[in-house]
From Swiss-Prot:
Protein name, entry field: Phosphate import ATP-binding protein PstB 2
Keywords on record: ATP-binding, Cell inner membrane, Cell membrane, Membrane, Nucleotide-binding, Phosphate transport, Translocase, Transport
Entry GO terms, CC: plasma membrane
Domain of life: Bacteria
Gene3D superfamilies xref list: P-loop containing nucleotide triphosphate hydrolases (3.40.50.300)
Species for this entry: Pectobacterium atrosepticum (strain SCRI 1043 / ATCC BAA-672)
Source species taxonomy: Bacteria, Pseudomonadati, Pseudomonadota, Gammaproteobacteria, Enterobacterales
Complex formation: The complex is composed of two ATP-binding proteins (PstB), two transmembrane proteins (PstC and PstA) and a solute-binding protein (PstS).
Residue ranges of every copy of the ABC transporter domain listed in the record: 12-253
Recorded catalytic activity of this chain's protein: phosphate(out) + ATP + H2O = ADP + 2 phosphate(in) + H(+)
SMART domains in UniProt: AAA
Family under the similarity heading: Belongs to the ABC transporter superfamily. Phosphate importer (TC 3.A.1.7) family.
Pfam families: ABC_tran (PF00005)
Length: 258
């Protein structure tokens, strides 16, 4: 299905995207625009394809030979689905945070510095500054500044997820993908992540997958509702939740789905 937003700047343009797990047709003719420096949410029931769509945006599926995408995904006008796309550079520009916190088995400091070292050669002073900058952006600096050399595993679940966000933005990407980042967190940690998402859009284009419709309503500027691999409706978030155009969307957001 084709749905585009009316905005002066689109960071990502998805055109006629189809995706396959082997012979299974998981995404069907998806077309949508993702606006720069805004938060776009993908919602829908389990198995609808929202996480699959998210993972096409940095070609995460290429880790699995049986998975393939067809169509076009334009990032700043360049089609990332071509064979010429440098995967390492793509993932530097399009960072990802997963459902469960995934700190590396190393210190808090090195969790942040690890990715930076892959792309930049910084002096120790500059690296210290980058680590502080990333942790500050992720609202974690005050909680970690006196224990940077402790293990990332020493942090609470909510802190670990903010560490993963800090790690993702440390390499200064353009886009940040969040795959259900709060599903394993308590309400207080969830609230802090949601506040952080609102702050991050000042500097990044943010795309979030969530099962929590209230979270999508609170955090996002645009929302896409998906069902069985199809894009059913895509609009600004207020419109989708208060005046949906499609009955399927209305049934889902009012709890009459199924």
């Amino acid at each position: 299905m084709s749905m585009t937003t009316e905005t002066s700047t689109n960071k990502i343009q998805v055109r006629d995207l189809n995706f396959y797990y082997g012979k299974f047709h998981a995404l069907k003719n998806i077309t949508l625009d993702i606006a720069a420096n805004q938060v776009t949410a993908f919602i829908g029931p389990s198995g609808c394809g929202k996480s699959t769509l998210l993972r096409t945006l940095n070609k995460m599926y290429q880790l699995y030979p049986e998975q393939r995408a067809e169509g076009d995904i334009l990032l700043d006008g360049n089609n990332i689905l071509t064979d010429k796309q440098d995967i390492a550079l793509l993932r530097a520009k399009v960072g990802m945070v997963f459902q469960k916190p995934t700190p590396f088995p190393m210190s808090i400091y090195d969790n942040i510095a690890f990715g930076v070292r892959l792309f930049e050669k910084l002096s120790r002073a500059d690296m210290d500054e980058r680590v502080q900058w990333a942790l500050t952006k992720a609202a974690l600096w005050q909680e970690t500044k006196d224990k940077l050399h402790q293990s990332g595993y020493s942090l609470s679940g909510g802190q670990q997820q903010r560490l993963c966000i800090a790690r993702g933005i440390a390499i200064r990407p353009d886009v940040l993908l969040l795959d259900e980042p709060c599903s394993a967190l308590d309400p207080i940690s969830t609230g802090r992540i949601e506040e952080l998402i609102s702050e991050l859009k000042k500097d990044y284009t943010v795309v979030i997958v969530t099962h929590n419709m209230q979270q999508a309503a609170r955090c996002s500027d645009h929302t896409a509702f998906m069902y069985l691999g199809e894009l059913i409706e895509f609009s600004d978030t207020d419109t989708l939740f208060t005046a949906p155009r499609q009955k399927q969307t209305e049934d889902y957001i009012t709890g009459r789905y199924g």
